[in-house]
């Protein structure tokens, strides 16, 4: 149970003078009033013991047999009933001390009790963490939140949020709330739309992020902005993403360069980690890895650096190879990649079959490998390779007897991603330290990419990022060679946030969009309000917005984002407790000038 600060004391009133979890040695012989929930109740031959719980912890109450009126009052109490008691704190005998409780050296002999709320039988127990379906937990979330682990998660989240605020305020950030009702943007995820009663046929949108507002705050002359910002996106749920609503630590700064922002963020994560957890940051300052390098080495722009495996490029070894599958993938834009598992060359056939199955799931046509055994190399491609090739391969990759090497070949990006997926697949072979936090920055993202379907140049990520080299780069370089001032912060394979140094120059913005096929008129139509603001004096600026929910997940070792949110939706974007979304009254629709046009009901097969 969450342990409150020792200095934390309740308001003294008729309900309580003390908290359950703060009583201990030194409290003996004191008269106290306590209020809370009946965590457990036990009848031991006339003595009734009640474990009373509040948000600070549990303490044991004793009702003695001679107190017949009290005995009768509590005898039939259900678990989770709310009571207020008066009594005297006494020390427990040495043989009855409970070392699992902070208050385990004392108990309270009850002299009076008031039953504030006699609970009905519960849909699932609070005191015992028995497996319970998520559907039931979300329907009765107010009961679920009483359970120790999730209760601690929510208190932890509150304390972390307060620490973030203090950290940023000490560095002259100004907390500013931006609008919740704003205009719809067709880019990105789907918007949640809100119809306007006063303007029939028109809609507000809930913000997917305060992106444009925070940039306009920089134009307004505020040097450093932040808020714990609610964001709304109509997208599907994942284990690390809540449908509908999430919170981010939204930040923007004027007159900064990329490294200035990195320094602020690294300091904040270090401060939170050291003060809120027992975890360790493996490298500080956080390593900076370019997009090209991270894909080559780890096959992902969200690498888990704890995994002691790196992808190696062996393209040059197979330029003149007799193995045509590899030789044909040594030209520009293609590659041959290798992943070495030390000491795993003697694994069973099932091990390799499962690995190949995973590779196919990732999009590969198969999975080539070579086992280096005492009797010599084994594997499906050994017969295609000469002895000299094998020796060069062993030397370059540092291969020894007992090792196995896996290969991928094809287009550079897809091959990197497949091998990166295999790297994660093989991570289960290693005992990764869950208390290590391996942060890194991914930098130097490409500004543009080629859209194979549309046969045109598109923006790779954020179209409002400043290109590295600014206008000169746009005028003199090939689009696919231009890099952007974009960056991601990643921890243990989880992307916490993307950010960028913004493009605050209208002339550069028009040219950047022109390369991606947009006319000046199209840019003005979509983003005119931003460009107009930038024409009236905009400072260089940049920002980032780490996910609050994901940060709590990492520090609390939670795999599911719903474990760190007080009232989350389920994976179908439903609030089971409040029965949302729900139908509304016809009069409400009429006031909004709306009619419902439902899709036809699909017949069950």
From Swiss-Prot:
The catalytic activity of this protein is classed by the Enzyme Commission as: 6.1.1.23
A GO molecular function held by the record = aspartate-tRNA(Asn) ligase activity
Q: Name one GO cellular component term.
A: cytoplasm
Q: Spell out the residue ranges making up region: Aspartate.
A: 211-214
Q: Which cysteines are joined by disulfide bonds?
A: none
- Say yes or no: keyword Ligase present: yes
The UniProt subunit note reads as follows: Homodimer.
NCBIfam families from the entry? aspS_bact, PRK00476.1
Q: Which family does it belong to?
A: Belongs to the class-II aminoacyl-tRNA synthetase family. Type 1 subfamily.
Give the protein name, as stated in the record: Aspartate--tRNA(Asp/Asn) ligase
This protein's species is Chlorobium limicola (strain DSM 245 / NBRC 103803 / 6330)
What's the encoding gene here?
A: aspS
